[in-house]
Amino acid sequence: MHALPRYAVFGNPAAHSKSPQIHQQFALQEGVDIEYGRICADIGGFAQAVSTFFETGGCGANVTVPFKQEAFHLADEHSDRALAAGAVNTLVWLEDGRIRGDNTDGIGLANDITQVKNIAIEGKTILLLGAGGAVRGVIPVLKEHRPARIVIANRTRAKAEELARLFGIEAVPMADVNGGFDIIINGTSGGLSGQLPAVSPKIFRDCRLAYDMVYGEAAKPFLDFARQSGAKKTADGLGMLVGQAAASYALWRGFKPDIRPVIEHMKAL
């Protein structure tokens, strides 16, 4: 057995993840020592990797692309947020041996936009690009902030329409998207391989904030495109990452970290 409480992030890829550094900063705030690692699970091997992790003393896990919807099905019970999202980014090991699934992505995104970037969501028009687990995970919390309108656009229109029906929002084909959006959020994973969403530069003409859910170099192609196309402000997903991580940490340990100094620490690395 491991002497320290042990946590990890599961993804494919996982080597780029900054989650270990973030959670170590939270542990410093709490005044405890923890282990936090990266686990690159094979496609098709996620459930076994999670099972092995918890059976060998794991206490909690974060889940990133492409496993968030698989994590939902793996969990034995779910929070209301996870049920609404149909996707899980946080797994909590319970004392009776069951696994609880939660979704803190929406909290991380909304807190970063409203509290760190100081842009209200209420009354705004929002465009979501992508229809995977990451996007589905943030819609319930975005709706709680009462935007005037949420539109979802995806390369595969059927997936966008499925989410639109589920959450009572609008869906349009990516190629048909025009301007008129205050906040544009990229939830596609194309940036990880340098690809841009297939949208017109015109969509950014009224944009107050263009936001990419990924961070660092992976966000650069989309944010450069948005900036050059007229977006007034751009942001990568580092603040969202720190915010969702803080909510996960609180679920595992009952300690709520202060995210602002951790965001600044991560920017300085």
Swiss-Prot record:
Matching Gene3D superfamilies: Leucine Dehydrogenase, chain A, domain 1, NAD(P)-binding Rossmann-like Domain
EC numbers, comma separated: 1.1.1.25
Binding site for shikimate: S17, K18, S19, T64, N89, D105, Y215
Gene Ontology BP annotations: amino acid biosynthetic process; aromatic amino acid family biosynthetic process; chorismate biosynthetic process; shikimate metabolic process
Metabolic or biological pathway: Metabolic intermediate biosynthesis; chorismate biosynthesis; chorismate from D-erythrose 4-phosphate and phosphoenolpyruvate: step 4/7
Active site (record annotation): K68 (proton acceptor)
MF annotations from Gene Ontology: NADP binding; shikimate 3-dehydrogenase (NADP+) activity
GO cellular component: cytosol
Residue pairs linked by disulfide bridges in the UniProt entry: none
InterPro entries reported in the protein's UniProt record: Aminoacid_DH-like_N_sf (IPR046346), NAD(P)-bd_dom_sf (IPR036291), SDH_C (IPR041121), Shikimate_DH (IPR011342), Shikimate_DH-bd_N (IPR013708), Shikimate_DH_fam (IPR022893), Shikm_DH/Glu-tRNA_Rdtase (IPR006151)
Record flagged with keyword Repeat: no
Catalytic activity, reaction form: shikimate + NADP(+) = 3-dehydroshikimate + NADPH + H(+)
Family of this protein: Belongs to the shikimate dehydrogenase family.
NCBIfam families linked to this entry: aroE, PRK00258.1-2
Name the record gives this protein: Shikimate dehydrogenase (NADP(+))
Gene: aroE
